[in-house]
Amino acid sequence: MSAYLLTAPAKINLYLEILGDRPDGFHELVMVMQTIGLYDRIEVRQNRSGDINLYCQHPEVPLTASNIAYRAAQLMMTRFADIYARVGGGVDITIEKNIPVAAGLAGGSTDGAAVLVGLNLLWDLGLTQPELQTLAAELGSDVPFCIGGGTVIATGRGEILDPLPDLDGIPIVLAKYSNIAVSTPWAYQTYRAQFGEHYLQDAASWRTRMTQIHAGGLIKAIQQKNIQAIAHELHNDLEKVVLPEFPQVQQLRDCFTKHGAIGTMMSGSGPSVFALCETLAQAQALKVQVAQELNDPALDLWVTHIASPGIQADFR
């Protein structure tokens, strides 16, 4: 039966600032989000059973409706029930999991985005990227970004996207302790408890701050593709609560700096940390140096690069 194979990239945050509390209970955010060259692969295949069947060999990936990929299929089947009924059958979703789980890299969100793109193609729905991103926002704050990828300034909950010039090819080293997981709700709730008194209190103040960030140093550095300046402007509010709670993450960050990373930061709610490098050779050397110094079997390291594409699909 017909199938599509999709590549679904991880993301890092080059910037994350929490502005305040929204009426819907979420935080108002300003982020610069960036896809990287570390991918999950997802096969979306029509079946005759009428069911959603989710397959993945990774022991930490749930095969139930708690998985965003599963919920993405449910959403498409519900929203396009007439087309689903005409097509007949269900869908088999097979995930090859290469992106670390619970790592602040949008691994679950990008899989959900891939299922949306795959079913759009499989059922010949003809949805545009903005239409897919509107659906994606119902699944999670990072999912709309994962559809298109690239370099983007994201506001609201993260679903309002404004493209920036691509930064293709900048080498990075990515690192995560496999024995550390950070709960995203915990990170944001702890930040609120510790720093909520400093939140901006109204939408007008949020807009003013967003304008300042749009005109600020990081955006200018991205427009100029100035790696040194980008590294200088990296910022993540959630480091204020995660690093004190997880000293190994702080140690990892410090180790990257010690061995010459141009810039280093935790991505999202962590615990993944990335380091920007000038050249691939520097990135490869940095990976070896950090692995040797920390000498921890639970520490996983990857050499990869900044990459612009979001979800990519091939017919099988």
Swiss-Prot record:
Pathway membership: Isoprenoid biosynthesis; isopentenyl diphosphate biosynthesis via DXP pathway; isopentenyl diphosphate from 1-deoxy-D-xylulose 5-phosphate: step 3/6
Residues annotated as the enzyme's active site: K11, D142
Residues that coordinate or bind ATP: P100, V101, A102, A103, G104, L105, A106, G107, G108, S109, T110
Enzyme class: transferase
Catalytic activity entry: 4-CDP-2-C-methyl-D-erythritol + ATP = 4-CDP-2-C-methyl-D-erythritol 2-phosphate + ADP + H(+)
Annotated GO MF terms: 4-(cytidine 5'-diphospho)-2-C-methyl-D-erythritol kinase activity; ATP binding
Record keywords, A-Z: ATP-binding, Isoprene biosynthesis, Kinase, Nucleotide-binding, Transferase
Enzyme Commission numbers on file: 2.7.1.148
Superkingdom of the organism of origin: Bacteria
Pfam families in alphabetical order: GHMP_kinases_C, GHMP_kinases_N
BP-aspect Gene Ontology terms: isopentenyl diphosphate biosynthetic process, methylerythritol 4-phosphate pathway; terpenoid biosynthetic process
The UniProt record lists the keyword Secreted: no
The keyword Nucleus is assigned to this record: no
Family under the similarity heading: Belongs to the GHMP kinase family. IspE subfamily.
PANTHER family: 4-DIPHOSPHOCYTIDYL-2-C-METHYL-D-ERYTHRITOL KINASE, CHLOROPLASTIC
Annotated NCBIfam families: ispE
Function text: Catalyzes the phosphorylation of the position 2 hydroxy group of 4-diphosphocytidyl-2C-methyl-D-erythritol.
Entry protein name: 4-diphosphocytidyl-2-C-methyl-D-erythritol kinase
Organism in which the protein naturally occurs: Picosynechococcus sp. (strain ATCC 27264 / PCC 7002 / PR-6) (Agmenellum quadruplicatum)
